[in-house]
């Protein structure tokens, strides 16, 4: 028998958490006041649903978003190409052509990215590393930017590896930037004919030194194709500026509501309330956390009606 589920209440829970997000990009990044406020709100709702609740704190490696997130392709103008004239794609290159990409929709920061400041005029090389496996020449992208495509493997072969592995290769080969192109997931769901980017983390404990100076983002399929066609295979220059501090530890907050059962056997139901961004679907829409909150409310109502459960929830 299924429990009841109030979709309107669930949407209200989700909106309440969204309203607590960062004023710039809507996220509730771990260790920030937005994340702590969200955790406290969830604990309060658990208590209001009749569940004894706690709020735990854990000291973990964290990263903090700054204020600069820029990506742009510049096509040099005629002025910038004159011998002895201004540098191509510099401010003095008056007839240059620029294509700006939008943070949150065209590209999103990946977990534990570092900071990087690459103006287009520096003409830093961008190297297409295909799926980024160990057979690719990562050293060719040293002091440059690697472009890796998120793909499934063919004929039973392994697909693109994890963010952790990719970032370790970037660090080992002294890359300044790493761009993963989403060409595998969330395709045609939110944007017709495109695969929208999403934010994923990595296992920072795998790194002896946190990669503070490597910018790490995921871009949509269309943006990745533009970088490949206009920069890797043509004369375009990429501007890449990412500001993230990944060098500190801080506290994350875990709200927990408990329904004691007749036995010590556990049913664990959870979702993450922290998020770098907040948006539709692929970025993070807070639906998981809101669903858990509504389930907790329904379990509280059932406990009032039926008494304690057999298992501890």
Regions found by a protein language model. Give the residues of each.
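A conserved hydrophobic secondary-structure block that centers on an alpha-helix together
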Residues: 128-185, 189
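Short amphipathic alpha-helices and their capping/turn segments at secondary-structure boundaries
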Residues: 3, 167-172, 256-260
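Short amphipathic alpha-helical segments and helix-helix/interface helices
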Residues: 43, 164-171, 224, 228
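Catalytic-core environment of secreted peptidases
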Residues: 7-35, 41-53, 145-161, 182-185, ...
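Surface-exposed loop and adjacent secondary-structure segments within mature catalytic domains
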Residues: 78, 82-83, 182-218, 249
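Short alpha-helical segments and helix-capping/turn motifs at coil-helix boundaries
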Residues: 39, 66-70, 159-168, 254
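Soluble metallo-hydrolase cores and metallopeptidase-like ectodomains found primarily
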Residues: 108-138, 204-282, 294-297, 301-308
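Noncatalytic luminal/extracellular "stalk/propeptide" segments of secretory-pathway proteins
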Residues: 7, 12-15, 19-145, 153-154
